[in-house]
Amino acid sequence: LEVVEFILYMLWDMGLKVGHATRDVDDCISQAKADMTIRTAMLEARFLTGDEELFTKFRKKFAGKILSGSARNFVKAKLDERDLRHKRSGESRYLVEPNVKEGKGGLRDLNTLFWIAKYCYAVDTLDELVSCGFLSREELNLFKRCDNFLWAVRCHLHFLTGRAEERLGFDNQSAMAEAMGFKSTSGLNKVERFMRQYFLIAKDVGDLTRIFCARLEAEQTKPGRMARLPALFQRQKQVHGFTISGQRLTMVRSDVFRRNPVNLIRMFKIANDYKLLIDPNTLREVTRSRHLIDKDLRENPEANKLFLEILTSRNHPERILRRMNEAGVLGKLLPDFGRIVAMMQFNMYHHYTADEHLLRAIGILSELERGELEDDHPLAHRLMSQNINRKVIYLAVLLHDIAKGRPEDHSLAGARIARRLGPRLGLTKNETELVAWLVEFHLVMSDTAQRRDLTDPQTIEDFVSNVQTLERLRHLLVLTVVDIRAVGPGVWNGWKGQLLRELYFEAEALLVGSASHANRPLRVANAQKEFLDVLQMNMPDWSEAKCNKYIARHHDAYWLSYDIDTKIKHAALLSSVEDSGFQIEVTEDKKQDVLELNFTCPDHPGLFSRLSGACAVAGLTIVDAKLAITKDGMALDVLRLQEPERENFPDKARVKRLIATIQSVLHGEILPPDRLADVPFSRRVNAFKLVNNVMIDNDVSSHSTVVEVSGLDRPGLLYALAKTLFNLNVTIVSARAVTFGERAVDVFYVQDLTGEKITRKSKLTAIMDGLQMVLANQSKPRRVEQSKQAKSSKSAKQAKQGIKAA
C-alpha cells in the first residue's frame, strides 16, 4: 500500500487524473455486479506486478460470477450507454466541432466495440478478434487505422491546449492541421482537408460499430429455443434475391450483387418500401461489392429509376439515403456526391459536413411534405402539397450544395451537374432545366429577403426579373426554407420566415400583375382606410379631424411599409411623445424570435448610431431596422432585436435594462465605446480570417444608395459602421444586419442630407475608405478620450435639449 500511495501522490503532483480504489476480490465482484461502469473497468484488468496468484483468482471469479450468462445484458447496456452518450455530445458524427472522445464516430465507440467483443468472446487483444470471427483481417486493419488516427488527434489536442480538451473546436482546428502535417490545395484549405480526414475516419468507425453491434445485438438478444418455435412457421418472403424475415432484409445468396449489380440499389429500395433493417452480413457484402458500381451501372435505366424512387419516397427518404451514404453506395452512384462526403467548410455558420447537410435537407423536405412542420411553415407546406413537382424539388434539394469545395462558384458548377444528372434519372428537359435553375439560384431568395429593403419596389422588380415565373418562385421558396433549416440548430427563426413570406407575396403579386406603380395611389388609399377602421376601434376618442391630421403627417411610402399593428403602435407613440420628449415601446414576438423596439423622438443626426450602440451595450443584436421620418420631422424607428446566440429569449429584466440603456445613451450618460471596450471577444470567432468587403450600389434601390458591408463579426460592429456614416454626413434610411456564423453582413440604405442618392465620386470614396477602416480595426472599441468625450457629451446635451423642446 505504501508503494501504491507513493505512486498515486507522484501522479497527482504531475497533474494527472487517476482513479483508484483498494478492494479485496469479493468487493470487486460485488461492485462489478452493482455497477456497469466498474464492471467495464475490471473487464480490462491487467496484471502489472505483485501476487499473480491473487490476480488469477480474481480473473476466474470474475469470469464465473460476472461474465457467465450475462453477455446479453452487457451488450444491451453498452449499446444504451452509447446511444445516451451520442445524444449528449451530438447525434451526428458530422458535427463540425466534434468531440474526439465521446462523440459519434469517436474513440469511445471503438472502446465499446472492444469491450463487447472481450466480454462475449474472452479476447485480450485486437488480433484475437479475427481468430474468433468478430472481425475480418480488413476490418481489423481498419479498426487499428481509426484507433491510431483518433489517438493522434486526441494527443495533439491535449498538448496544444495544455488540458484534457476533448472537443475539436474551431479555435484549435487550424493549429491541429498544421501540427499533423496537412497542406492546402485548390478548393480545400489545410483545415478542411484535416477535418475531412477526421470525418472519413469517423465514418469508418460508424461502419464498424453499425455492422458489428448489429451482429452482436442480433446474437445476444435471440430468444430461447422454445420461444423461437412460432417463428419456424412464419413465411419468409423472397423479393429479387433477398429474404424478408421479421424486420430484417437478408441476401439469399452471397453472389446476389455480382450476378446483378442493380441489386446494390434495389436492396435499399426494398428496405425502404418494407421499413426493414438490413442484415449485418448483407451490409458487409454491400461494402465489398461497391466496386461493381461503375459507369455502366450509373447509366443503367433501371438503377436510376430505383434511385429516383428512393429519393422521392414518401417513406422517410433521408433514412435510406443515409444508409446508402454510410455504406458508400450513394457516393459511388453519384460521384459528385462522393466528392463532398465528410467535407466541412471552415466557418461557424455551417454546423455539419456538406453531405450531412444535404441529407438533413431531404429529411426536412419530407417532414414539410407530411405536414409535420406546417405550424412553422404554413406557406411552404401549402405549396408543397399543391403546386410542387416532387421529382424536381427533391433532386434540387439533394444537389443544391453538391459542388461545394471546388475553386469555382458552387452554384454554377452544381447547375452543370444537375443538367447532366437530370436526363440520366429520367427527368424531362423542362424538369431538368428547372432543377438546374434552382441549384444555380438557390441563394437568391435568402439573400434578397435578409439583405434588401422589401418595401422598395426596385428590390421586388429585380428579384422578379430573375425568377420570371410562378413555378420557379414556388419551388425556390420551398428550397430556401429547407436549406436554411438544414444548416443547423438555431439558424432558422420566425423572423427569417416572415421575411421570406413577405418577399414571396410581393413577388407573386408582381408576377400575376396585381402590383404595379400604376395602382400605387390606390394601394396607399386602401392602407389608409384600413388604418382608420382599426384606429377607431383602438382609439375611439380620436376625432375625424385628428385622424385626418395624423394621416397627413406621413409620406405615402409609410403606408405601404408597415403592418397594421405597427401603424397603430406608432399612432399611440406619436400622440404621447409631446409629454415626454421621446417614447419607447418594446414588445415580444416569440413566433419570430425577436424583440420589436418602436422608438420615436424628434429626428436628429446620428440617432440610429446611438440606438445601435445602446443595443450593443445591452448585449442584443439588431437584425432589421426600418427608419422613417414624418413630414413634421419626427423619427419613427422600428428595430428588431435578437440574443446573439439565439438560445434564450430576452426576459423582462433584460428588456427593462435595454430601455434604461437607450435612455442613458441618448442623454449622454453612457458612451457606447466605453462599455463595448469591456465586452469579451469570442475565441472561436478569432480563429477565422475573412476578406473584408464594402459594396456600394446605386442601381438596386429606387430611392437610396445601398451600402453592403461584410467582415468578421465583433461586438458593436454595427454601431461603429453607423457612427462612421453619421460622421460622413450620411443619412441612414433603413438597415439590415445578418450574421452567418463568424461573418457579419450589414446593409444600409443611405441618402445625402438633401434626401437624394449619393452620386459624388469623392463622397462615395470617403464612405468606402471609412467603412474599410472600421472593418480593418479588429481591436475592441477604444474608450472615448477626454476631449472627444466632452464633445460627445455636448452633442448628447443638444440632442437632449431637442427632445425636451419637443
Regions found by a protein language model. Give the residues of each.
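Non-catalytic interface/linker regions that flank or bridge core catalytic/transmembrane domains
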Residues: 2-350, 419
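Regulatory modules associated with amino-acid/nitrogen control
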Residues: 149-150, 182, 188-249, 317-319, ...
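Active-site-adjacent "gating/activation" loops or surface patches in catalytic cores
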Residues: 230-250, 326-346, 352-397, 402, ...
